Curated annotation (Swiss-Prot):
Binding residues annotated for UDP-alpha-D-glucose, in chain numbering: 299, 355-356, 373-381, 395-398
Function: May glycosylate diterpenes or flavonols in leaves.
Pfam families: UDPGT (PF00201)
Gene behind this protein: UGT73E1
GO molecular function: UDP-glucosyltransferase activity
InterPro entries membership: UDP_glucos_trans, UDP_glycos_trans_CS
Cystines in this chain: none
Enzyme Commission code: 2.4.1.-
Biological classification of the source: Eukaryota, Viridiplantae, Streptophyta, Embryophyta, Tracheophyta
Name assigned to this protein: UDP-glycosyltransferase 73E1
Family label: Belongs to the UDP-glycosyltransferase family.
Amino acid sequence: MSPKMVAPPTNLHFVLFPLMAQGHLVPMVDIARILAQRGATVTIITTPYHANRVRPVISRAIATNLKIQLLELQLRSTEAGLPEGCESFDQLPSFEYWKNISTAIDLLQQPAEDLLRELSPPPDCIISDFLFPWTTDVARRLNIPRLVFNGPGCFYLLCIHVAITSNILGENEPVSSNTERVVLPGLPDRIEVTKLQIVGSSRPANVDEMGSWLRAVEAEKASFGIVVNTFEELEPEYVEEYKTVKDKKMWCIGPVSLCNKTGPDLAERGNKAAITEHNCLKWLDERKLGSVLYVCLGSLARISAAQAIELGLGLESINRPFIWCVRNETDELKTWFLDGFEERVRDRGLIVHGWAPQVLILSHPTIGGFLTHCGWNSTIESITAGVPMITWPFFADQFLNEAFIVEVLKIGVRIGVERACLFGEEDKVGVLVKKEDVKKAVECLMDEDEDGDQRRKRVIELAKMAKIAMAEGGSSYENVSSLIRDVTETVRAPH
């Protein structure tokens, strides 16, 4: 990295295109605020449904004189074969609609370009999700740079790169090899996974999915650079190696969640929480330091009623306080809660029916463990809070993130899931985790033995590094300065 320089306030205008999924939208809004705090004008373009999700956060930012605006584009859902009104990945009936929402995203290209041409001041730079490949073409026509936002960290991104370039994901292998464990070659650590865990699916990618992915990869190659929500001290060897293999500008500017400093911002990131900040903190304040297990399986993962009941029975058996965020409740599960479970755990279990204020909860000193689906936002938020994890991956990047948590960082314990469960397949998959598995993993993570102490020490040290990285003079702070300088030089350069 170049010598530390204080970047002067910028007057650049960044336009951000987040993917229509909670886990991609939330960090993009954080990035918008980080850039606006440096003086930039930022426009976020998304669908009405997602604009409504983040409007309170943006309104608070505007009230502090940050130059951020939300503009809406209507997703042509029915034209793309989606159910009417479906604007988000978490609204999809099943993963099989992935192709349709990709089509709907492609249909945004022309109206988005028309909107960009009308903006005043005109845009200087586009930052868009990896899965918006057409923004590279739009940026080229507007003669401005496009930066790619990659949701996961560099460990995952490098693993995928290695898997593709070494032909581990090639089509010439017998189908049975999908479940055989393979070692990813050339990595700083020995990482052994199955092919299906690499792609994070219950089946190999089909032609359409691979086509979409490769189109996004080609668009990334033609982009100006890559923005990653990580910090260099978390995964230094993977950051350096990924920069090398991509041979492209890259800025690690995370953990972006640390831009949330006030109670309302911590409590309302994305969807409105189903519990108030006051009630949540009051409950936590009454517990012992490091005693509470937080359980949340993300914004997209779904589990069957039978699996949820098994998880609940496991939580009941651990005899520790817990907060359980429960989403997508079926009638069967609602009945089970009312038939005695909530009453039995009332003194030590807080059930949040809906969205939980995750960063607020994780940053509370009474939280001693996090049972997580291993989405990257949850992973880095837990690290930032200094909380060790129990890993329960479902799909996408989550199995590789689990390997990073358990094998590379050594700050987590596996619950023991080996196969993916795509949303929409939860009833077919059934119960993968028994109540005994829950109890065993919690005891392993939170007991006061030497392994547990070492995990806690490691994650607390990483949390300190995260905060230093985001503070003035830290690596991520300097990388934001570098990003602004690089874009400024490109925009000002004669064409």
